[in-house]
UniProtKB/Swiss-Prot annotation:
Sequence ranges assigned to domain Death in this UniProt record: 757-845
Species lineage: Eukaryota, Metazoa, Chordata, Craniata, Vertebrata
Keyword Repeat: yes
UniProt entry keywords in alphabetical sequence: Leucine-rich repeat, Repeat
Name the UniProt record assigns to this protein: Leucine-rich repeat and death domain-containing protein 1
Polar residues compositional bias, start-end: 56-65
SMART domains the UniProt entry points to: LRR_BAC, LRR_SD22, LRR_TYP
Repeat keyword on record: yes
Gene this protein is translated from: Lrrd1
Compositional bias ranges of the Acidic residues kind: 19-31
Length: 853
């Protein structure tokens, strides 16, 4: 249910409830999916929220997605891998003229996000208002319903066009008749654990799109090749090692995605797919760029990322319509000159290869928009790159480049330039002529200064110059009115110039690991600054003018020279995160209560003698770290800590705290409690009130027992009691929880201890004299047990002793574990001087310990 109690996803999309039993009847679900069951928004559109941390190559996808949303078109795939081919306008393409020559490639785009990310979307659900039985646009979504069989009841819905069965356990299509689902055009079977594509697939004659990614399919059946209307076939993340013969039957196929399989070669028959526009073969085991790939006349996008290809064939020049070539993470040592005969290439990804040089013929790439040459062995870039006048993104990081060509100034459309971790000593002035540059990254070089002419790059928004040899803050950057992100970590800057006060538009500033000795007053003029990192400098005080920094949300001052908490910080009323760890703070001022919005506070590795109770006034605090790996140790956690009712994460590790406050249970929001390497011997009973606690770390303490009801912490997922006197946590911790492995371990441990105790009883029974056994009975208070046992006159002594010990164990089982009884028996044997028996028991213990190890 949504937060408001409705059965609707955010954005207005219907939410399906889970089936009670896998494989149960789905007619109710079909009724729920029916447009007649509920009134739904007729203008539902596809929603997407890609991560901001994407490659530059995703920019074109983002803009196309925006256009798509403006048109209210949608995506039929409820979830697909972000590295797969993402459909952008299925509805539009399938409702076109109906011709088999439909140009679906325009509705698809190969997305190059970091591999492994998941793209979550929702099915298109438009045109439902007024839908009747004559409609040919019905969608059924049965994702993650626990289905084990194909839902044959689906045939009750006559006009199913899009069917989604992702994340079930469907293995076959039994029960489907040839006449059923004749109108089905899209079928998605992601994550069903399929070992093969069901042969019944051939019955869906009108199928145009099949997505069977994330299964365990090892081969493509010939029956699939009979689906002549197939436009798009997605089989990513399976175990396919060969392509079948007969591919020529899929003559209308436009998209073939076989990423993350086990293909070692590409058959010549692939060249028969004359309408293929998008081919994804990323992360297979290809060692050769097959010539058959070169004779796909309509191929627009080719992804060979993550293979072991060492060279390109001359025939690559035949790919006249190729616009996007992805060959990152291969073994290319050179580029065949024929590749520079591709007139339409717009994106070329060659990162993480072994290229030593780029041919001057790169000048032929007049349409090139993106060039990624990261992680190669390049020492220079050809001057002719200046002829790539449409280039927008150039990435050269992690090479051995010493300088950029002066003619780079001609790249008037360049928006992003990444030259991190090379061998550059100077930043050429020619960069100042890049009038459209937005992002400039030169981190990890040996640059000593930034030319003043940089001020001419008026559109720059982000500059990164970390870990260079810059001694003076580049004043040219202060004139850039669009600059909002600036990072100068790991340089030798000792002061901030007055010009900095003019950069009022700056939002993010990093200057950690420099030589600053004061918090410059010029920084106080940055009234829009939200993030400031001054860690690992030599700052001792904070000026009062910091109160002018009204937008500051994150302030990092760790590893400086503060000997007292600067009261001036307490004027930052919008501060959310403060890190002032690794200093020499001894106390916290009362004024800290003025930080009304503080959420995260790191005070670790200072020299507090007592826990600063002033912190307990922070009603909005969610994370507190006051751990100590060096210096003075805290010995007490005050009861006032319970006042921080919003606290979610508390870290008091590496101190000398002995007791946890009795009212700790009042921290009802606590999710993680880190208290390793202290001197804690027990937890108070109120600890059981921490109902949302998920992580508990009590390593290296003096814990001898845990509250018996700790199993009531139903949210607990991670526990660590290593290096405590506990033999093991009590069984109650794990019973009924999701820690089945621990439960099994504890059960086996109990069984093992029981067997060891029985062996010890046998040793005692077969070794002790009758006189000594009488003494042993007295020490163990078991005389009554032995005397009340029915013993036959002929029963051997060792049998009588063994039965007496078993009876004693039965009486004590409720109170003591097998291990405790063993220790109790061992002490009693020592009292009566039965040293020979003790030696035998010790030998047994050593033997069992060795076996366990």
């Amino acid at each position: 249910m949504s937060e408001d109690g409705s059965n609707v996803e955010p954005g207005g999309f219907p939410r399906f409830e889970s089936l009670e039993e896998p494989g149960s009847e789905i007619s109710d679900l079909l009724d729920e999916a029916s447009p007649y069951s509920k009134s739904k928004d007729s203008n539902q559109i596809y929603e997407a929220n890609p991560s901001k941390d994407t490659e530059q190559s995703a920019a074109s996808f983002t803009s196309q997605l925006d256009r798509n949303e403006e048109k209210n078109t949608g995506i039929p795939f409820s979830e697909t891998n972000i590295a797969d081919i993402i459909p952008l306008s299925i509805e539009e393409s399938l409702q076109s003229s109906g011709s088999s020559e439909t140009k679906m490639a325009e509705d698809y785009y190969p997305v190059k996000f970091p591999t492994g990310r998941k793209f979550r979307g929702r099915i298109f659900n438009g045109n439902q208002k007024g839908l009747d039985m004559k409609s040919d646009n019905f969608t059924v979504n049965l994702d993650a319903k626990g289905l084990q069989e194909f839902p044959v009841d689906i045939v009750k819905v006559k006009y199913v066009k899009y069917l989604y069965l992702d994340k079930n356990q469907i293995k076959n299509f039994q029960g489907i008749d040839p006449g059923d689902l004749l109108g089905l055009e899209i079928l998605s079977l992601q994550e069903n654990g399929l070992s093969s594509i069901p042969l019944e697939i051939q019955l869906f004659h009108n199928l145009k799109i099949l997505n069977a990614s994330y299964n365990e399919i090892s081969q493509i059946p010939k029956e699939l090749l009979q689906l002549e209307n197939m436009r798009q076939l997605l089989l990513n993340s399976n175990h396919i090692d060969t392509l079948p013969s007969g591919l020529e039957h899929l003559r209308y196929l436009e998209t073939l995605s076989l990423g993350k399989n086990m293909l070692t070669y590409i058959p010549d028959s692939l060249s028969s797919l004359k309408n293929l526009r998008i081919l994804n073969l990323e992360y297979n085991q290809l060692t050769i760029f097959s010539k058959s790939l070169c004779f796909l006349p309509k191929l627009n996008s080719l992804n060979l990322t993550g293979n072991m290809i060492g060279s390109l064939p001359k025939e690559v020049r035949e790919l006249k319509n190729l616009e996007s070539l992805l060959m990152d993470h291969n073994k290319l040592t050179f580029l065949a000159v024929e590749i520079f005969q591709l007139p339409k290439i717009k994106e070329l990804h060659l990162a993480d290869n072994k290229l030593e040089a780029i041919s001057p013929k790169i000048e032929n790439f007049k349409e090139l928009r993106l060039l990624n040459l990261d992680k190669n062995l390049l020492q220079s870039i050809p001057k002719k790159i200046s002829h790539c006048v449409n280039l927008e993104s150039l990435s050269l990081s992690d090479n051995n480049i010493e300088e950029l060509p002066k003619k780079i100034r001609k790249l008037k459309n360049l928006r992003q330039l990444h030259v991190n971790r090379n061998k550059m000593i100077t930043m050429t002035e020619e960069i100042s002529h890049l009038s459209n540059i937005h992002i400039l990254e030169f981190s990890g070089n040996q640059i000593t200064h930034v030319p003043i002419e940089i001020k001419n790059c008026r559109k720059i928004t982000r500059v990164e110059l970390n870990y260079n040899n810059i001694m003076y803050f580049p004043v040219g950057l202060c004139a850039l009115q669009s600059l909002d992100y600036l990072s100068f970590n790991g340089n030798y800057i000792s002061e901030i110039p007055v010009d900095m006060s003019f950069s009022k538009q700056l939002l993010h500033l990093e200057l950690n690991r420099n030589k600053l000795t004061v918090f410059s007053k010029h920084l106080c003029s940055l009234t829009n600054l939200e993030y400031l990192d001054l860690a690992k400098n030599q700052i001792m005080t904070i000026p009062s003018c910091i109160s002018a920094m009204v937008s500051l949300h994150v302030l990092i001052l760790s590893d400086n020279k503060f000997e007292s908490f600067p009261k001036e910080l307490c004027s930052l009323k919008n501060l959310r995160v403060l890190d002032i760890s690794e200093n020499k703070l001894q106390k916290i001022p009362l004024e800290i209560s003025k930080l009304k919005r503080i959420q995260k506070l790191n005070l670790s590795n200072n020299i507090f003698t007592n826990f600063p109770v002033e912190l307990c006034q922070l009603q909005t605090l969610e994370e507190l770290n006051i751990s100590q790996t060096s210096g003075k140790k805290l010995t007490r956690l005050p009861e006032e800590v319970s006042h921080m009712t919003q606290l979610k994460i508390l870290n008091i590790s590496n101190n000398a705290i002995k007791d946890i406050p009795k009212n700790i249970g009042e921290l009802r929001s606590l999710v993680s409690f880190y208290a390793s390497n202290n001197q804690i011997s027990s937890l108070p009973s109120s600890f059981l009130s921490l109902e949302v606690l998920q992580s508990l770390d009590l390593r290296g303490n003096n814990m001898t027992a845990l509250p018996s009801g700790i199993y009531k912490l139903s949210s607990l997922k991670e526990i660590n009691f290593d290096d405590n006197p506990l033999m093991r946590p009590p069984m109650e911790i794990c019973k009924g929880k999701e820690m089945h492995m621990i439960t099994c371990y504890l059960q086996r441990a109990d069984e093992r201890d029981e067997k060891i105790l029985e062996k010890i009883f046998n040793i005692v029974a077969n070794s002790i004299t009758e006189t000594n056994f009488e003494f042993l009975q007295q020490k163990l208070n078991m005389a009554s047990s032995a005397n009340n046992m029915p013993v036959r006159p002929t029963t051997p002594l060792n049998e009588r002793i063994y039965q007496a010990l078993i009876k004693w164990k039965a009486e004590k089982d409720v109170q003591f574990t097998a291990t405790a009884l063993r220790d109790k028996l061992f002490r009693a044997l020592n009292m009566i001087g039965a040293y020979d028996i003790m030696d035998k028991i010790t030998a047994l213990n050593l033997y069992t310990s060795a076996i366990k190890l």
